[in-house]
């Protein structure tokens, strides 16, 4: 019998093995509908057609990731890296076309680990359609060593998935009244979900719709409970920038994004201490989108 090689249920257990990303071959995404929440309607970023990332920038970023990998290895953690791919190639499907892709810098966006299962997320950004390819050699290896492997339904990313002419310039994102995504098909980023054993928390955001969360809940059945949360954020993306469980009984929250629906009370009712993180000093440098805005309104 194969020894369990994938076995992760939460965000705080001692780390034994991890995938650290890579920016080799990175591209800069052209503007596309999934990026609408982040740029005003008349901004020049909406005319950005994508580009190859400058070699100097790639090397500087890769050096940081390599150093991070070394720190983990020095602590006894097994570090795996994605396969190098050329993300500067265009992508064309029957539903869309993009001139550049993204990178393999963020495995946490692509792969959701629930226990002994690896789920490839059905992400909503067109430029990331084939991002999973960088991780396939590792996933196949883990599968052969005993892990479960699931690929969520791949979204077509046709125009029906996105709200036309969407902007958060004057009205904040709202999952009911002002959502950038429709419920045309299920989609989510893995980083939208935060794991606490059998309890999984998420917030509908610019890359995750409720159809995606419904698919995940039905897929996992009664093995896990998926809880929807809502925080004040003009254009939310990924819950782990807002809520991070540190250990059983302690959860860190972003004071700039207070909970709007009372869902944080579930932690308090179960004797968890909810602590606000110190105020952040923002510095934004992204390879995944055009000249991003550097601030979330609070």
Give residue spans per PLM region:
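The feature marks the mature, well-folded catalytic cores of soluble enzymes
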Residues: 1-289, 293
């Amino acid at each position: 019998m194969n020894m369990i090689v994938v076995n992760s249920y939460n965000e705080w257990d001692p780390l034994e093995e991890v995938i650290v990303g890579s920016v080799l071959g990175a591209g800069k995404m052209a503007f596309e509908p999934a990026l609408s929440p982040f740029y005003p309607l008349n901004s020049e970023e909406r005319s950005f057609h994508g580009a190859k990332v400058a070699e100097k920038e790639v090397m500087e970023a890769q050096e940081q990731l390599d150093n991070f990998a070394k720190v983990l290895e020095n602590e006894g953690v097994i570090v795996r890296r994605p396969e190098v791919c050329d993300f500067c190639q265009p992508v064309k499907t029957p539903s869309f076309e993009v001139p550049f892709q993204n990178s393999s810098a963020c495995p946490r966006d692509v792969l959701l680990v629930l226990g002994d299962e690896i789920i490839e997320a059905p992400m909503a950004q067109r430029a990331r359609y084939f991002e999973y390819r960088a991780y396939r050699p590792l996933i196949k290896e883990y599968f052969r060593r005993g892990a479960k492997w699931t690929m969520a339904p791949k979204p077509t990313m046709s125009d029906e998935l996105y709200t036309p002419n969407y902007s958060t310039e004057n009205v904040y994102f709202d999952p009911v009244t002002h959502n950038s995504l429709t419920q045309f098909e299920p989609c989510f980023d893995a980083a939208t979900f935060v794991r606490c054993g059998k309890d999984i928390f998420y917030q509908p955001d610019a890359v995750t719709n409720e159809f995606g969360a419904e698919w995940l809940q039905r897929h996992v059945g009664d093995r896990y409970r998926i809880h929807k949360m809502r925080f004040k954020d003009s254009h939310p993306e990924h819950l782990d920038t807002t809520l991070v469980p540190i250990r059983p009984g302690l959860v860190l929250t972003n004071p700039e994004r207070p909970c709007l629906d009372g869902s944080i009370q579930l932690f308090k009712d179960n004797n968890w201490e909810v602590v606000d993180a110190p105020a952040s000093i923002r510095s934004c440098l992204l390879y995944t989108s055009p000249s991003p805005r550097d601030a979330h309104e609070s």
